[in-house]
Amino acid sequence: MLRRALLCACVGVMAAGAAAETTRTLRAQLSGDPAAPFVVENLAGAMTVVAGDGDAVVAVATVHADDAALADAMRFEQVRNENGVPVLRVIYPLDRERTIRYEADGGDRHHGHRHHGLEWLFGSWDGTEVKYDGHRVRVSSSSGARLFADIEVRVPRRALSATFKNHVGELSAEGIEGRILLDTGRGGITARRLKGEIKADTGSGEVLAEDVTGSFSCDTGSGECNVTGFDGTELSCDTGSGEVRIRRAKADLIVADTGSGRIVVEQADAGEFRGDTGSGGIDAELTGTRLRRVKADTGSGHVSLRIPADASFEVFADQGSGSLHCGFADATAVKDDHKTVGYRRGDGKVRIAIDTGSGGATVDPAR
């Protein structure tokens, strides 16, 4: 009964808060050539970028505020940054509001990420300080005036040179191409069906990429990096803390690096693979005929490699503790003072280097 009463009380507060909220719609259109570099920037909220039907960059912001006065103080304008690049920027009344409140609905209004979850709603996230539009401002989930903007950006269906910067909140892009930077200070990033030179950078949050072609780099201070479906030259995933998962990737080079977390690679056709984790295992399935070089390094964790059944290879392992096992029956063991430190098969075309501080290693034929 107490649990039900608490739940009803929470729902009542949420409904009351939602009823008090004022919304307003702002529209901005980029002047000048959309093929030239440009930026779209927001302080707090969710940002969605999609391909439109026209030849202009058009952004619509839905402002959410505690009252009409705050909502009316918001603007959406084109300015220039310190490098002279045009910026479509949501202008907040930061001369009088030094702390604003942003409450994402269950962690995300648009994309279904897990990494914020209910921490936003119930206040376990206590805020972050941001430099924005010449001001220092604090964005919190529990204090300050409610004030944020959810943005939808529509861009031409051709190559762009664009940065989409969302300081606090989720950022998603779908069906666009060019030289693209997706950047959040705190919030997850989703990239679907992108083409070109694509970079996703978040200080804290999960990065999810699907069906990307060209080159893709993911950098997150804390959070998972998940890539499913890649075809291009280079794929790089780097996280300070969190798992890296790559599936169905074709690339000349795949790099996966995490300070703490597992690296899992499935159905990867790569010329070269480099995996490095401070704490956590590496499990990589490397298929295809282009494979030439593998480097797997873990401070603590097991390394499991699966390579083509017909591969000629040479593998050497430097292990603080743990043993090396090879599942190729016709491979020749390389000994050092009665200890197996490597294996050789055929002409050794694929060079494999394994380094573990603590943990075993296996090299097996892929099924």
Language-model segment annotations:
Residues 1-367:
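Intrinsically disordered, low-complexity terminal regions
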